Amino acid sequence: MNYFELFSLSPSFELDTAVLSERYRELQRAVHPDKFANASEQDKRLAVQHTAQVNDGYNTLKHPISRAEHMLSLKGIDLSHESTTVKDTMFLMQQMEWREALEEISDCDDPDEAIEHLHQSFGEYRGDITAQLAQKIGSEEASVLEQAADLVRKLKFMDKLQAELERAEDALF
């Protein structure tokens, strides 16, 4: 299912989330199962199915990574069940450095500074990757779309690192 069509939005990585939220509320009002309380069993089932589609679509489109995955899937590149890893050795080396820094936080003289430095580093890298992705994901060229897929994989790694950083931060306080 094309969630952009469901929400009457143009397929775009850069999405106005306020418009998305408004369309979500409109669709929910139209298909919510409570509106079909006195309807036939079939209509009730359809309302539940439509509500599930609207919820899935909203959750997919509101998050940049899942939105990018959806856009790629619409172009024939399915990342949802893959085990392909990033092959960019520079990125992998950077990731190893970040993981080492994460492991050393508790032993630092100033863990707050180390955490702040990692937050800043992650944010800058994520911003760069996201900007590149926004440029490439609209392409119709297979090679450019594969580059976009690699950028999505990198963003997934960054999400995992961010979660690890937050756990490390929570463990200190």
UniProtKB/Swiss-Prot annotation:
InterPro entries the UniProt entry points to: DnaJ_domain, HscB, HscB_C_sf, HscB_oligo_C, J_dom_sf
Subunit structure: Interacts with HscA and stimulates its ATPase activity.
Pfam families tied to this protein: HSCB_C
Residue ranges constituting the J domain according to the UniProt record: 2-74
Family per similarity comment: Belongs to the HscB family.
Claim: Chaperone is one of the keywords in the record: yes
Name this protein carries in UniProt: Co-chaperone protein HscB homolog
Annotated Gene Ontology cellular component terms: iron-sulfur cluster transfer complex
Keyword Amino-acid biosynthesis: no
Entry keyword set: Chaperone
CDD domains (UniProt xref): DnaJ
Function summary: Co-chaperone involved in the maturation of iron-sulfur cluster-containing proteins. Seems to help targeting proteins to be folded toward HscA.
PROSITE patterns, per the entry: DNAJ_2
GO BP term, pick one: protein complex oligomerization
A single MF term (Gene Ontology): protein-folding chaperone binding
